[in-house]
Amino acid sequence: LCQFLLIEFSLSLRRKIFIWQAIVRDQSVSTKGFFCFTKLPNDLSAPCPIFTINFYMVVRIFITGGTFDKEYNEITGQLFFKDTHMHDLLEMGRSKVPVEIRTLMMIDSLEMTNEDRELIVRQCLNCEEEQIVITHGTDTMTETALLLAEKVKGKTIVLTGAMIPIKFGSSDGLFNLGSALAFAQSLPAGVYVAMNGRWFYGNNVRKNKQTGLFEEIS
């Protein structure tokens, strides 16, 4: 049986959108997200209210940099960081997934320190969302995934990135981002890497330096 507790609501011109917390009694699972009701129940304490709902999971997106967000200087030929392309990519991909975006850093993953990784861990632990996507440079993505797998439990965390900068036009970044968002909403709690259209367990994946592809360790 399910009991729905109203915790907050907002109004729009076209419909009422209610943010609810659902508690599944028989599984002792608490899930937060957006529930769009076609009909508001009269009795909120009823064990099984009868109304139609659509559930929209909120995904937290953490930006850390990497090739995914690098800019290209046409004069010098150098790559550099400016602003994240995340908002443009979500619009380009026509994504309707509710997200909360936060930039933690904009660095090459080869420059990422232990302190940077601890910051990522703390942000994942402290955020309210239980579904998280992290954009990350591919060179040390697996190191961060391994640390997250050790320290963060009870959340679905998906790391993804790109081998080619978004600004190059032929980047794999948009495809990888879409995959990561889908995996974050569908996979059980755990840490994963999403690259090349596949997902891997965060503690059992490596980047093949010869092929540029990600693969299982065993």
Which sequence ranges carry the predicted segments?
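Intrinsic-disorder-associated, low-complexity terminal segments enriched in Asp/Asn/His/Tyr and depleted
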Residues: 26, 43, 54-56
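Extreme N-terminal basic, low-complexity initiation segments
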Residues: 1-12
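Serine residues within intrinsically disordered or low-complexity segments
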Residues: 10-12, 28-30, 45
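Active-site histidine-anchored catalytic micro-motif
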Residues: 57-218
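Compositionally biased, low-complexity segments
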Residues: 6-8, 24-26, 41
